[in-house]
């Protein structure tokens, strides 16, 4: 290994210290994501007496499909927001906070908060997911051969987080109560947010600034972002509610 590398650049298994921050953030985000996702269809199709929503399988799968599609669809504007407005570091933080709020809203036992929670998690994931991987790449200088192994280590966090989510949220959701499982996802994401806030200085300038220097351009993009956000939120809400047809007993 190059002896000229700074100590902080080899902190984590020979990799930059900031990789620890991103590893743990991704781990907790994936824990909350897969933990909650594993409960969705089961919760929606269970009888009301079992704490569920008593939806039919087609209705539940339709909602699940819209949620899954919206998560990946929102990654496109999420990347744009980081690139043009906030920078990747702040966008990841804002996304993590919105995800956390979404999980806690899901933990409230109400049909209305269920759909609101899904919308929040979708938006937050769209902000976080495309940008955290970008920051990983920016931790390394051009030509640094460690970048491939750095991504390998980073992607291990996805496997660890998903396993934790299925074990913790799955157990609490089925054995204790559905909303306990959703709440556990929120607690996990809270850990992720806190550790990101307290250790994000280790990221240095990686993903810190958007690719804009002109203040007028920034204001223009902020204005566009506000209108686009309103349209996206309206689309998600009407999409979820449009397929939610339940009988009078449930209402």
Specify the residue positions occupied by each region the protein language model found.
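C-terminal ends and interior cores of transmembrane alpha-helices
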Residues: 94-115
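Intracellular loop-helix junctions on the cytosolic face of multi-pass helical membrane proteins
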Residues: 1-15, 142, 170-251
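Cytoplasmic membrane-interface "Motif A"-like loop-to-helix N-cap segments
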Residues: 84-96, 143-144
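Short amphipathic helix-loop junctions that connect adjacent transmembrane helices
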Residues: 38-59, 245-251
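Central cavity-lining transmembrane alpha-helices of secondary-active solute carriers
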Residues: 61-82, 129, 163
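Intracellular juxtamembrane helix-capping segments at the cytosolic ends
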Residues: 127-142
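Hydrophobic core of transmembrane alpha-helices in multi-pass small-molecule transporters
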Residues: 27, 102, 113-128
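A gly/Pro-rich, aromatic-decorated transmembrane alpha-helix motif that marks the paired
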Residues: 37-38, 77, 160-176
């Amino acid at each position: 290994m190059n002896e000229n590398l700074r100590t902080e650049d080899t902190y984590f298994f020979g990799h930059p210290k900031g990789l620890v921050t991103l590893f743990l953030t991704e781990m907790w985000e994936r824990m909350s994501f897969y933990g909650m996702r594993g409960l969705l269809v089961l919760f929606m199709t269970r009888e009301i007496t079992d704490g569920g929503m008593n939806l039919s399988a087609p209705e539940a799968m339709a909602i699940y499909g819209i949620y899954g599609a919206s998560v990946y669809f929102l990654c496109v504007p999420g990347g744009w927001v980081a690139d043009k407005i906030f920078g990747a570091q702040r966008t990841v933080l804002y996304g993590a906070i919105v995800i956390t709020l979404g999980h806690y809203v899901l933990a409230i036992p109400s049909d209305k908060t269920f759909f609101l929670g899904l919308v929040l998690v979708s938006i937050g994931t769209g902000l976080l997911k495309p940008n955290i991987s970008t920051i990983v790449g920016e931790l390394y200088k051009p030509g640094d051969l460690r970048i491939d192994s750095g991504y390998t280590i980073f992607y291990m966090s996805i496997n660890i987080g998903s396993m934790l989510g299925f074990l913790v949220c799955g157990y609490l959701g089925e054995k204790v109560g559905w909303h306990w499982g959703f709440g556990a996802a929120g607690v996990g994401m809270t850990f992720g947010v806190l550790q990101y806030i307290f250790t994000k200085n280790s990221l240095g300038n990686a993903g810190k600034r958007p690719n804009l220097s002109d203040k007028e351009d920034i204001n223009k993009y902020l204005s566009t972002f506000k209108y686009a956000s309103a349209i996206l939120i309206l689309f998600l809400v009407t999409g979820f509610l449009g397929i939610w047809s339940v009988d009078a007993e449930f209402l």
